[in-house]
Structure formats: structure tokens, C-alpha cells
């Protein structure tokens, strides 16, 4: 993600160094995770807990890759798993484990889809002073994060228009502007266009 490398450079080349970074969904945020791994070894993922009801977090990219491979599929087919993971003691344990990780983290990475669902369980005490990385941050999300005590919001989607537009809209605009047929562009090509146009990511200070 060019946006994160740009921010790292712009904010003194040490903003993400050794930061404790928590991902609500590593599978949805793989690109961000790979970039953050360049600056910090302290990456934690909640995929196993939130997807499969396992009261244990995933530490590091290698463990995430193991989970995202065959292990995740196997867990989805474990007989009787739901009887255990849906029990109140297990759900309480998962909520406690995830909340502790959120509280200890400096940076939270939140997918655009399911944004409010991920954050609704948490209070100002949990999110106060955090940096949030997400995409396509509309005004209602800025107000929501402000009320939660978040210090910094990093919107990885550059703002091309007067109103915030989603990633798919921006990709469509770039394809038309540079005469790129749908399906021919790669992520690297779109990233190069964004970099050459010097479109800065949004850094928002809601408080």
C-alpha cells in the first residue's frame, strides 16, 4: 500500500516502527499487513476468534498464512464446533481476549465492510488515543471514531473527488482516464498511477 509507505515517510520515517498493530480481519487486510510487517513484528490478527470462535489470537504473518490456508477450511467443518463456540463461556472468553488486544494496540486496522460491527462493542476507554487504518472514511465514520476517542484516522483511499469515493469508483476513474481496459490493469499498475499523480492518502485528526 503506497499510502502507508507515504505516511511512514511523511511522519518522520518511524511512525509505524515497532507499533502494536491489531487486525480485525487479516484476510481482508493482507496488503496492509504485508506493508506493516516491514516496520513492526508486533502484528496480531483476530481472524480465528471472530470467524471460528477460537479464544486465541494469531501472531504474525506466517501464522496468519497457516490459518488462511487449509486450517481455516478444516475448522469450518469440525463436527459439533458450533455447540462449543456458541456457548456463553467461550464467547465471553473471546470478547475478553479481543478487547485486551485492542486496548494494548497502538494501531487498529478495520475493514471497510463491517466497520461498525467490528467497533460497536468498544468504548472510549478501549479506543482512546488509537490510530485507525481503514478505507473510504465518510463523515459519519469520522464522527463515530471521534466519539470513541480515536486520535488519528488514516484513510488508505486517496481523495480524488470533492466527496469521498470508494476504491472501485476510483479504479473506474483511473481506467477511463488512462484508457486501461477492465481486467488488464494490475494492482501494481494502479498503484504506480496513484504514486505518479502524487495523490496523498487522507490523515484525519478527528478530535
Task: Please tell me what each predicted stretch does.
Residues 1-189, 200:
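Conserved mixed alpha/beta catalytic, RNA-binding, or beta-rich assembly cores of soluble enzyme
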Residues 190-207:
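N-terminal basic/disordered segments at the start of proteins
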